[in-house]
């Protein structure tokens, strides 16, 4: 059974790690101490080269704790303008790390990335977060314009989850 942590009585897990991997591990380990079976922790975000990797692990809180996706995008575009990196082509990547744990033991961490560029205007309304300004390599559309099926095939999270699924298959079936 798959459950969202928000649907449990587990206390909020503080993301105080210094990397996506640390945060994913913190989440998975903490939740696995309260829930039976295999538990997955996830952390992900956008890294923009012109901003030395920002927003990075602060992607969700980049424009403030309760900021909307639009406010996060606006802040990112302002920061790019501030450092003179305007235009349609700043190199960036989405990175996701998923960690697998059970009964307080870490079973593995798996990373997925998708390289691309940041556009200077939001395009599309699919997805969430920074999707409307990220164009993955090999495409002209932003994540906000791509179908869910295409995005899941190439996305950072899809890649990380597929790597994790291979590990779970080995644990469960000895493959």
Model segments located where?
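Anionic-ligand binding patches
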Residues: 1-175
């Amino acid at each position: 059974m798959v459950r969202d942590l928000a649907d449990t009585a587990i206390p909020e897990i503080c993301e105080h790690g210094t990397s996506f991997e640390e945060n994913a591990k913190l989440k998975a380990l903490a939740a696995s101490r309260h829930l039976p079976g295999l538990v997955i922790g996830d952390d992900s975000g956008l890294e923009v080269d012109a901003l030395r990797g920002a927003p990075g692990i602060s992607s969700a809180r980049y424009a403030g704790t309760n900021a909307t996706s639009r406010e996060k995008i606006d802040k990112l575009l302002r920061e790019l303008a501030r450092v003179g990196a305007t235009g349609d082509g700043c190199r960036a990547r989405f990175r996701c790390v998923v960690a697998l744990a059970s009964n307080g033991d870490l079973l593995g961490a798996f990373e997925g990335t998708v390289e691309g560029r940041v556009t200077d205007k939001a395009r599309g309304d699919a997805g969430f977060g920074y999707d409307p300004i990220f164009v993955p390599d090999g495409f002209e559309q932003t994540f906000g314009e791509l179908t869910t099926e295409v995005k899941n095939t190439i996305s950072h999270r899809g890649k990380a989850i597929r790597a994790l699924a291979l590990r779970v298959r080995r644990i469960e079936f000895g493959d």
